[in-house]
Amino acid sequence: DYPTVGGPVTAFTELTPDLYYSDGSLGTLKIPSIGLTVKVYEGTGSAPLLKGAGHFTGTTAWAGNYCVAGHNRGVRNDFGKIHTLHTGDTITLTTPMGTRSYSVTSVTKISDTDTSMLEATADNCITLFTCVENQPAYRWCVRAVSR
């Protein structure tokens, strides 16, 4: 008998300098059903979100659960319509690693303290987050799995 290794198997790609484009972005996110095309930058603070969507630092750069935040109003409202997505809608991510298409599986309202959807996964998926307008204690969370 061999000992069991604890915890589920997860996929993870380390963010390395070669995964940045010359313009400083990590890639481009497209959601045709809401007419969105936005570049993704590293970090979820004010500087990256003023340029586009922000990749959560410490989450995977490709394999596994790729996590992205975006504003939903104001100067940049890139994620203003993500709560209107439907199961089966397509999300496409293009990075130096390639292009991957995802299919939306859930659109949920979560507490702003709920970090469970940021956790690494075994399957390739993308998770989008944005604020809920006039409800600062909540976030919209969209999960889509690789096709």
Where are these regions (language model features)?
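Solvent-exposed, non-transmembrane regions of membrane-associated and secreted proteins
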Residues: 1-147
